[in-house]
A protein has these predicted regions:
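Conserved short histidine dyad/triad with adjacent acidic residue
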Residues: 18-35, 70
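Ligand-binding pocket scaffold of soluble enzyme catalytic domains
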Residues: 28, 50, 84
C-alpha cells in the first residue's frame, strides 16, 4: 500500500543535504557568508535576525521560513536581547566572508 495518491514522489539530490538546528544565544550572529545552492532557514524559538548585504535586517519569528538564493551574501543570528533556535537546510558549500560589524548588527530591523 502506498502512502501517496496518484503516484509516488522521487527523492532528488539528497546525498549532500545538510539539516542543522542552531541555537544562538542573545547577541550571537554568523559572519557574512554565501551558499552555493541557497539556504532555507526556519525559526523554531525566540527572535532571530537575518540580512542580505545591502538590504534591511529582517526579524524572524517562529514558523516563518526565510530563503536565501544561491551566492547571496547574508548573515543570521539571534536578536541582541533574545536567543533563537534556527533550523537550516542547505546543500553544496558555504563560503565564509567578513564578520558582521556591531554597527551592521544593530541596524534597524524590519518585518517583511
Amino acid at each position: 500500500q502506498s502512502n501517496f495518491m496518484g503516484g509516488n514522489p522521487s527523492v532528488e539530490n539528497s546525498d549532500d543535504q545538510r539539516l542543522l538546528r542552531l541555537r544562538f544565544p542573545a547577541g550571537v550572529r554568523s559572519n557574512w557568508h554565501t551558499h552555493t545552492d541557497g539556504q532555507l532557514l526556519m525559526l523554531e524559538e525566540g527572535l532571530g535576525l537575518t540580512q542580505v548585504r545591502g538590504e534591511a535586517i529582517y526579524e524572524m519569528h517562529p514558523g516563518e521560513p526565510w530563503w536565501t538564493g544561491s551566492g547571496v551574501e547574508h548573515w543570521h543570528g539571534a536578536d541582541p536581547t533574545e536567543a533563537s533556535l534556527q533550523l537550516t537546510i542547505y546543500s553544496g558549500s558555504v563560503e565564509w566572508l567578513d564578520p558582521v560589524t556591531d554597527e551592521q548588527y544593530m541596524g534597524r530591523a524590519t518585518r517583511r
